[in-house]
C-alpha cells in the first residue's frame, strides 16, 4: 500500500511522539544514515551502467563524456570541461579513446575553426541510449514502488544538492518543466 509523502517537518508536541523511533541526531552530528544511503544508491545506479561499459573497455568517465555529448550534439570541449568540472588534461585520455573507438567525433567550429565541437557517432548514440535506458529502468522500478509525488520530491532533492551558485547553469540544461521549479535559496544565490 502506498502512502503519500508529507513535506511538512515532524514537530511533535513532546518526546512521547518519538517513542519507538531513533532520536534525531543533533545538528552538529554527521548524517551517517543519509551519507551511506546516498553512497549505496549511487553505487548501484552507476553499477548498472558500469557493467555495460566494461564490454567496451570504458568506465564512468567515458560514460559522463558520452552522456553529455549525446544530450548536447555540437558541444564545445570548453563547455564539456565546465559541465564536468575537470581539467583538459583529465579529459584528454577519455576523449581520445572515445574518438579513436568511433563513439564520438570532433568537428571544427563554423565560426572559429580552432574550436572543437563534439558529436556522437551513430555507434556512440546507440551506446548512450542503451545506458540511459538501463538507468531509466532503475528509476522506473523505484518510482513504481513509491507514491506519485516521489519523482518530483526526488528531483527537488537532487537539484537542492547542487551548489546554489551552480544551480541556474544546471537548470538551463534541464527540460522546460523542470527549469521552472525554484528552491528557496535560489533567490539568494
Q: Where are these predicted regions, by residue range?
A:
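N-terminal leader segment of winged-helix/HTH proteins
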Residues: 1-56, 183-189
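Charged, amphipathic alpha-helical coiled-coil/dimerization segments
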Residues: 6-8, 17-20, 46, 96-159
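Short, locally clustered residues in the helix-turn-helix/winged-helix DNA-binding domain
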Residues: 39, 67-71, 132
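N-terminal helix-turn-helix DNA-binding core of bacterial DNA-binding proteins
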Residues: 47-90, 101
